[in-house]
Amino acid sequence: LRSYRWFGGDGLRAFSHRSRMRQLGFGAEEHLGKPLIAILNTWSDINPCHMHLRERAGQVKRGVWVAGGFPVEFPVATLSETFQKPTPMMYRNLLAMETEELLRSYPVDGAVLMGGCDKTTPALLMGAASAGLPAIFVPAGPMLRGNYRGQPLGSGTDMWKYWDDKRAGLIGECEMADLECGLARSPGHCMTMGTASTMTSAAEALGITLPGAASIPAVDSAHCRMAAASGRRIVEMVWEDLTTDEILTADAFEDAVATVLALGGSTNAVIHLIAMAGRCGVPLTLEDFDEISRRVPVLANIRPSGKYLMEDFYYAGGLPGLLGRLARVPGALHAERRTVSGGTLGEQVADAPVHDEDVIRGPDTALADEGGVAVLRGNLAPDGAVIKHIAAEPRLLKHTGPAVVFDDYHQLQLRINDPSLAITADSVLVLRNSGPQGGPGMPEYGMLPIPSYLLAKGVRDMVRISDARMSGTSYGACVLHVAPESWVGGPLALVRDGDPITLDVRARELRLEVAGSQLADRRAQWQPPPRRYER
């Protein structure tokens, strides 16, 4: 055991370490020779996605004790998508570094990683991958479905929908008060297929959770049992020396990409999975997403791309059911690879039942023939851009319209409802200086608001282009992550009001219909914008 280096033997250091364990109240007979399991807990009073994890950590400990291990709980940074500004994206790598260094520096033999809110999952897995110990992930789980006057509500997705209705004058403060109370009713992360559900599902597809773990509602008693089972399993993994490098392989990342695309999942998964793969030495690229998206259909009928919510998905069979259906697509999954269960992915999903064929589809009844996220290229995005086309109005997937340009998010907020801009439903809204450096931190500004006077006319989607990200709960014909970003002089910086822009998702193209000579003249005149932050 790795921990024996700290506590075993008759040297001064071992004596000192055992003495300090006694100071903590633990005799040598309680921990010496047993796997020490770090429980990395992202619980916080200010993070509603994780507010139940203090209790769940106790259930993980129970499992560790039962299996003959010794649990030690570590509080780590909590990344709350709801409250942290300007964006928790700026802190993902900080949590990844904290995770890695805690696991490297303390006398632990394995780790249980607890979290679920958007950036937490990739951060914990990145850190654990670099540390290289046996590790298992316990997803926080989705909250219960919301309720508005008897109708199910999806967090994020229905918030945007009803906010647009309010801006259009269709509902008032009374309705908004009911919505405010009904949108989020329990602990857990968003119960739509937002970034949280997407990334915890990706973690399960990677094989770093127990089968079915990602779909269990946060407050379901099955979630308690899963936490305890994860505690038991990590002790076994330590004795088996089953480390992250045996789980997080190139095949595993390809399967995670296929799963995200079949779920109609968040565009943020593109950024996170590429970063996670990089930590594991796996060369995952935008081209891999593009290639896989062309052969993997959308099988999950979950908002914002579909009709249902994560609670329905769980009852319908959860991620094991979806993976079982995805396995029917030739070449979609690598069934022989190992997972933390000790078996193979194929064994996990071979007999996984599906109880509702409308929630979890088969290849013959797919919501779309191609994966939910498409990679775009062209003279406006030479290094690529993405669009969640499954959540856009089909009429906009091949569209040419005049640009209406906003230089930053503040200007967008001030001017979007200005009638003098003469924005029409055919206009293409462009937001720049919202990328990693320009934002800063690539905030989720990409679902640009539609002018209120168009909302009042019934317009609910427009082509919108930015170098920002958007929430996984968002929807619409939003082209995101345009690269290079405008702040460093990417082509987005050269767009002017009225320039024709063409989006063609089927052809994977994003083009600025302006002559190259004109663009060269504009580039010669371009000046980088002033930095808007001091640190």
Predicted segment positions?
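Catalytic or ion-coupling anion/metal-binding cores of large enzyme and transporter domains
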Residues: L1-A38, T42-D45, C49-M51, R56-V76, ...
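A short, small-residue-rich loop immediately preceding and capping a beta-strand
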Residues: L103-L124, A135-A140
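Short, well-structured alpha-helical segments in soluble
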Residues: L94-Y106
